[in-house]
């Protein structure tokens, strides 16, 4: 029976829009193969293997389950007000974070992602959304953006935040709030990551505290 890479199979089955999107799903821990969490895009799978992507928001309201990450953060950070703000969503993917910003009254949102064609149609077609695809966040410059954001959110994979913070700071308005998701598996270095998950509490703490 023919075997394929997991990221390619996700695209073939219509579970991901591109291999880039598939890799993001896998590294986010939302792809199950035969009931187990897959952690590597290169994992070999067969056509008969049961593959499930659990990213979809179970309520059916948000374009991705990732929206709830930002909802939780904004509910916790009560002093971060979205209404009327010029926002940048770094690593927008399907647009869960962008959707939350829109629903909370953002004036405009610039959705930035290295991939292409991932942003969900209801989000993409909102008049307040500017889409910047095929763009590595590390290469952002203020002159290339339609505005300088005063609220910046990020959910990035495959790269430590310390490598993108200089670019984000360079495009931000003089007064800007940043709400950034920290993913320890991309912060502590490959040697400290076993099966794709950082299990040591001290390492997880160091990823957050620096």
Go through the PLM ranges and name each one.
Residues 1-47, 86:
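A basic, amphipathic helix-loop patch mediating RNA/tRNA/ribosome contacts
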Residues 82-93:
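Conserved class I S-adenosyl-L-methionine
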Residues 93-98, 115:
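Residues at the N-terminus of the alpha-helix immediately C-terminal to the conserved SAM/SAH-binding loop
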Residues 108-163:
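S-adenosyl-L-methionine
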Residues 66-83:
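Conserved alpha-helix/loop element of class I SAM-dependent methyltransferases that forms part
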Residues 184-200:
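Short, glycine-/aromatic-enriched active-site segment of Class I SAM-dependent methyltransferases
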Residues 100-108:
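Conserved S-adenosyl-L-methionine
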Residues 162-179:
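A short glycine-rich, Lys/Arg-flanked "PGG" loop and its adjoining helix->strand segment in the class I
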